Amino acid sequence: MKQGSRSEGARGDIRGYIQKTGERNLYRIKKGLVPNMNVEGHMYVNDKLKHLIDDEIEMYQLNRNSTFLPAVVQIANVSTLPGIVKASIALPDVHAGYGFSIGNVAAFDMSNEKAIISPGGVGFDINCGVRLIRTNLFYEDIKDKQDELAQLLFNNIPVGVGSQGCILCNQDKLDEALCLGMDWCVKEGYAWVEDKLNCEDNGRSFYADSNYVSVRAKKRGITQMGTLGAGNHYAEIQIVDEIYDKRSAKLMGIEKKNQVCIMIHSGSRGLGHQIATDALIEMEKSMTKYKIDVIDKQLACTPIHSKEGQNYLKAMGSACNFAWINRSSMTFLARQTFAKIFNQSPDDLDMHVIYDISHNIAKMEDHLVDGKMKKLLVHRKGSTRAFPPFHPAVPLDYQYCGQPILIGGTMGTYSYVLTGTDKAMETTFGSTCHGAGRALSRNKSRNTLNYMDVLQKMKEENISIRVASPKLIMEEAPESYKNVSEVVNTCHEAGISNKCFRLKPVAVIKG
């Protein structure tokens, strides 16, 4: 297949290759949809969400000369990559992305010398993720201060595309930070020791080596530490709206409805984007060297154990550390904000991190494949780790309930906390959904939604909102996304994650 031809490959009526299985909410994408599939695709979607998948397919089939590829074709394309095992997996928030769809999980056998690593399987915002902080406050404590809290958070947390961070950082400090992750934050006084214990990988990637991060990437990152960014990134003040699993919620410090939490969704900013861009350029060159031919040039990749593959892992690990520092820095700012308004210390307010999780990452993990334990490189792009109770990677506090999974909703809608399951380990490489997933493009949202209508809806829901860029009001409106409750329910019914509790926003801060 000629590299660069994005609309070739899918054969006939795509829907003929999608088959419902006997498992709840699980479809097969059969081999043959595109040439040279090594494994089939697995897609988790319920009846209410499947029409969005069908809409993407119909748009593609009406205009095959377009550069647009629907998520189903992208899932099939990923299955052609060298070294992939079991299946290319689509989760219910899946939608078209760069090379890999967003909401895709793909794992590659590290014992296979041809197995690859691909920046498209991680995404440009490396270690984009979510952090949830609890408090001992309840809605009654904040309802008269809701607008004041929203404004002070907006003032304290730098937002927007060109925002600059509050953490002054020189080149030496940045290099140290990129290698140490949250350990650097603890050392510098921006995080508590216990914060990192309830963080995926303890907030530090040991792949990281800042020597493999370009000067340009460092230049973009040095001013952005502790910044929210724009797009779908946010900081929200939320209240617990529903508790489904009281035992697990209690382990997370959540015991009653209306308890106040803070959710932060952000990533590695310009540094991560530049690392991804640099890697894609290098990998496009290296594919000729390693005789790799991809069905779509956006799937640029290289063998995991090659020099280029190892260089990307080290740079990607550095971006992961930057993102954990970024969310930790904003946690520091959120704690300061609450301390000022309530005239109590963050410790007195019980502002502890419940968990921090990534949904754009590639990681070496052990998984059972065809009855054998194998070391795999698991790519999760727009998908979240979902490890079960008693897994060694799950923090001590959560050994009995499984790993907390933080699912951010859309502006003005619910967010969820889930827990990991054994079924996820068996079927999805210990993975589940990450959020709502876009239903409308940003351009379509701007053209079809009304700014004032969206604001009025937020007002009716008694949600305070602060946003740096007005166009984001339409782009990030709930109508632009899939129904997050349907996404979460699909995964719960399929058994790949369990619902624990639901959160409702009362204040939203966006770039």
UniProtKB/Swiss-Prot annotation:
Recorded E.C. number(s)? 6.5.1.8
What positions does UniProt annotate as the active site of this protein?
Answer: H434
Supply the Pfam families for this chain: RtcB
- Give GO terms: molecular function aspect only: GTP binding; metal ion binding; RNA ligase (ATP) activity; RNA ligase (GTP) activity
The record lists Mn(2+) 2 as bound by C128, H265, H359
Catalytic activity, per the record?
a 3'-end 3'-phospho-ribonucleotide-RNA + a 5'-end dephospho-ribonucleoside-RNA + GTP = a ribonucleotidyl-ribonucleotide-RNA + GMP + diphosphate; a 3'-end 2',3'-cyclophospho-ribonucleotide-RNA + a 5'-end dephospho-ribonucleoside-RNA + GTP + H2O = a ribonucleotidyl-ribonucleotide-RNA + GMP + diphosphate + H(+)
**Gene3D superfamilies given in the database record:** tRNA-splicing ligase RtcB (3.90.1860.10)
Q: InterPro entries recorded for this chain?
A: RtcB, RtcB-like_sf, RtcB_euk
Q: Tell me which Gene Ontology terms the entry assigns under biological process.
A: tRNA splicing, via endonucleolytic cleavage and ligation
Annotated keywords: GTP-binding, Ligase, Manganese, Metal-binding, Nucleotide-binding, tRNA processing
Which residues are noted in the entry as GMP-binding?
232-236, 359-360, 408-411, 415, 434-437, 510
Q: Where does Mn(2+) 1 bind?
A: D125, C128, H233
UniProt keyword Nucleotide-binding, yes or no: yes
Write down how the cofactor binds this protein. Binds 2 manganese ions per subunit.
What GO terms fall under cellular component here?
nucleus; tRNA-splicing ligase complex
List cofactor names only.
Mn(2+)
Q: What is the top-level taxon of the source organism?
A: Eukaryota
Enzyme class, top EC level, equals ligase
Q: What does this protein do?
A: Catalytic subunit of the tRNA-splicing ligase complex that acts by directly joining spliced tRNA halves to mature-sized tRNAs by incorporating the precursor-derived splice junction phosphate into the mature tRNA as a canonical 3',5'-phosphodiester. May act as an RNA ligase with broad substrate specificity, and may function toward other RNAs.
**Assembly and interactions?**
Catalytic component of the tRNA-splicing ligase complex.
Q: Which family does it belong to?
A: Belongs to the RtcB family.
What else the UniProt entry mentions is:
Ligation probably proceeds through 3 nucleotidyl transfer steps, with 2',3'-cyclic phosphate termini being hydrolyzed to 3'-P termini in a step that precedes 3'-P activation with GMP. In the first nucleotidyl transfer step, RTCB reacts with GTP to form a covalent RTCB-histidine-GMP intermediate with release of PPi; in the second step, the GMP moiety is transferred to the RNA 3'-P; in the third step, the 5'-OH from the opposite RNA strand attacks the activated 3'-P to form a 3',5'-phosphodiester bond and release GMP.
HAMAP family per UniProt: RtcB_euk (MF_03144)
Q: What is this protein called?
A: RNA-splicing ligase RtcB homolog
The organism of origin for this protein? Plasmodium knowlesi (strain H)
